[in-house]
Amino acid sequence: MALSIDDLLRRAVENKSSDLHLKVGNHPYLRVDGLLTPITDVPRITPEEMLSMAFSMMTNRQKQKFKETAELDMAYGVAGLGRFRVNVFQQRGNVGMVLRVIPTKIRTVEELNLPPVISKICEEQRGLVLVTGTTGSGKSTTLASMIDRINANRADHIITIEDPIEFLHRDKRSFINQREVEVDTANFSTALRAGLRQDPDVILVGEMRDLETISTALLAAETGHMVFSTLHTLDATETIQRIIAVFPPPEQKQIRLQLAATLKAVVSQRLVRRADDKGRVPAVEVMIATAYIKDCIINADKTRLIHDAIAAGTSQYGMQTFDQSLFDLYTKELITLDEALSRASNADEFKLRIQGIRSAADAAREEMASQMADFERFARK
């Protein structure tokens, strides 16, 4: 019997996998709870089977593009099963594929175990919010949850620009248009420029990949729109530095001012293994653009202080570092101590905190919190 991509995807969904990996000469592999596992009862894939499965998901235009570029991103749906994000590529002269399972249900902030401040960020009416992390860290899932929260609570016009469209949003209180790159529009920057003429309240840009897209996103946020996007950065400090570095040196001072004026929050996340072995849970760093943080963005010599400011802003602003997030997950018994220590930026300090021993970092955080409070009072005058 011919190997069917739909049957393999059904196996992926049944096994609660996040991804399906296909390679000529190998059994299919599933990524379950972060680990790759072969489906050994399925025969090794032949070149002909791989090409047939890949082409069965493509339109004629997509087939032509793949033949020309040997790379293709697309979305694929199976009735009664779900939607999948597909990347098709060439490796060692053969076709390879990775298919990401897109959950059919958009989960809430609470269901995703995201910190409560995320819900507050969704109440912002204008500005820029960035969700960052490595590939597979759950950025799209978090963004979908935030957009769905706005959709349920505000009568807004929401435009999403994605490559490809992943989560399908249905109109609730809001009116949503979803546009897919190379299907509904040429690219992110073109769609974003056009979107400014479509009376939007909220714009989701799937990824800020280039200078033009970043510039237009900043302009959109500056002119009174709420803009959400993603970057492949590890934390808030790297995110700020990455955006600034995209621009030529003569423009960077102005971009710092523009970014400080528009940025509302940076949410960076990593997935860590649950203590009950039932999947993974996000460890999340949250930076809120307070007056002190804005000053750190404007002044290049102070950008390095952003991490310390996040650590000091927990009680007043709801900010948190990755290590603070890990500590919270550990105290809630969602992750094990071994998992927390293996993921912590400073394992020694983490151990001291568990033991209730005050560290030099605690004193530094208190001093930073005092400086931030003084700065905020001065900024309000």
Label the model's feature ranges:
Residues M1-K381:
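Short, flexible helix-loop junctions that flank or precede catalytic/ligand sites
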